[in-house]
Amino acid sequence: MRAWLLGVGLSLLAPLLAAQVSLPHDEYLPADPFGQRQDKPEQVLFEVQRYSLTVGSELRPGGRPNQAEAGVWLLLEGRSLLAGSPVERARLHFVEGGAGLRAARLEDDANTLVITYPLSLLPVIRQQLDAPGADYVQRRFYGNGLIWADLHSAPQSGAR
């Protein structure tokens, strides 16, 4: 009888144990149709309080004048919403087309999150940051190698 109860209990618990882990700001992630987000990820989450835009170019020593590189970056700074998380900055790097998109990563002794976006998204992101309401940066690294990063805004009430 005891073994039967244990078996029934485990069969009832199994779906709950396999369910997706709930974390702050889950509602901003897209659906997970392939079930890749099952474990509890390392999460970075902070509210953006200010930002700055940098447009720069660089010619490396010994390079020819036509080999200069240019770039656009937004530096977002704010306040962490997770206890113990030192990450309160994100550098959004914009690249032409989709070339050179890299997974979100931590730099500068793990205090700055770097996210790469296509340059075509810069106007949309600037508009989002300039709109009223709170904005947040989020990154999640799952044990299976899945990496999610985003910039999202708090829900807004629509003007009618």
Locate the predicted segments by residue.
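OB-fold ssDNA-binding interfaces and closely related basic DNA-contact patches used
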Residues: A19-V87, L92
